[in-house]
Amino acid sequence: MNQEAKKIATSLYGRVNVPAVERCRVNFCTDLEKSVLMSNFERRGWNQVGPDDEWNFYWASTQTCRSLFSVESGYRMNDNQMINHFPNHYELSRKDLLVKNIKRYRKELEREGSLLAEKAEVVLPGGQVVTRYIHLDFVPITFVLPADYNMFVEEYRKSPQSTWIMKPCGKSQGTGIFLINKLSKLKKWSREAKTPFHPQLSKESYVISRYIDNPLLIGGKKFDLRLYVLVTSFRPLKAYLFQLGFCRFCTVKYDTSVTELDNMYVHLTNVSVQKHGGDYNSIHGGKMSVENLRLYLEGTRGRAVTEKLFAAMQWLIVHSLKAVAPVMANDRHCFECYGYDIIIDNQLKPWLVEVNASPSLTSTTVNDRILKYKLIDNILSVVLPPDGVPDVRWNKLPNAEALGSFELLIDEELLEKDEPSSGVRGRNSKYK
């Protein structure tokens, strides 16, 4: 980055936490030499070292993190080391485990007699009456295949005109996803892919979810939201929402006809899919800011329902985190930024599609680069003490300036202490 660019970056992104006299005290290591990462580390005057050297801060891939925390590695971190993933992040980011944890969370709340687990009867499009959760119905009905195949067939037959979406559990960026509207299509795929629906025979797990076939459309096109959520602790739960998320649009107008069922440019919003389409626009990258979405909805639907929608999105994020908190390895050296993918239906109800433990830091447009640079800058400001040097003994209570574009979603420690703090508890209290 040249000197002029550095000046612009400084004015755009605000303060640099680390005092000049201490800027060389931090050694960083990374597997992902993305420009938004490297420029943030360099701006702080950090020194790059290798994984076998004495590092303070490691921005690692999920594979490196798993290897580092494995019993075989024998590696033990000291108080001045931090890493950007929790050891078993996959409890949230693997599609099958996320579903399992949310189902367990609901059952536990039911056993406790919690009002959160209240249910009500719902009439399906085909006229069938089913029971659904009132407050925790934020994930489309989902089954893990092959284990839940018989349960899936039972649910499918309740509403045979429904469309379902099939996804491999451990893959991302739209890989291996397809839609079905007939059991015969699923069976045909099983034969051709040589993936039998038998728990002992299948080598790979899939999730199959009821497809949200009534998405909110803008300009006739389907979109989803990518929101960034920073977790600094799971027990007690402490999480922040980045306010500069974005919408990702399909390049082709939405069409529910059977002939378009296999057209992924109609149904999948992933940039990795859409950028190969003939209608992809490399200037805006098929993206719109969440702030512009809010303004659009306030103008077309009204402020009250828009506020309700955004509150509902925060609600589903918090409860998805609460669902996995009991099983997460809560290592004090760790923090993690998750990419939440959410679809809004035409009734303005948000649905959680999936959670990514390694949201892309590749910049596809100028605005993308600005947003992701600021995301990394703000993450570093939140997870590091005021002097900018990693220290796990720090109480992880960043001040308002350090939050940047993050807002506190939940801090269970503050709730438990019942200490009002600059209005923060008021924002948290609904998640008790």
Regions found by a protein language model. Name each.
Residues M151, E155, S159-C337, Q347-P350, ...:
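Catalytic core of tubulin tyrosine ligase-like
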Residues I342-I344, K349-A357:
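A short beta-strand motif that forms the metal-chelation/ATP-contact edge
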Residues F41, L98, T142, I208, ...:
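A residue-level signal for conserved active-site and pocket-lining positions in enzyme catalytic cores
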Residues R25-C29, F86-Y90, P215, V305, ...:
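Conserved aromatic-histidine-acidic binding/catalytic patches
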Residues N281-H284, E419-K432:
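Polybasic/polar functional segments that serve as interface/processing modules
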Residues G14-E22, N78-Q81, M288-R303:
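A short, surface-exposed helix-loop junction/capping segment
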Residues N356-T364:
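Glycine-rich phosphate/pyrophosphate-binding beta-alpha loops
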Residues K6-V18, C24-S172, L179-K185, R191-E192:
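Conserved N-proximal alpha/beta basic substrate-recognition cap immediately N-terminal to
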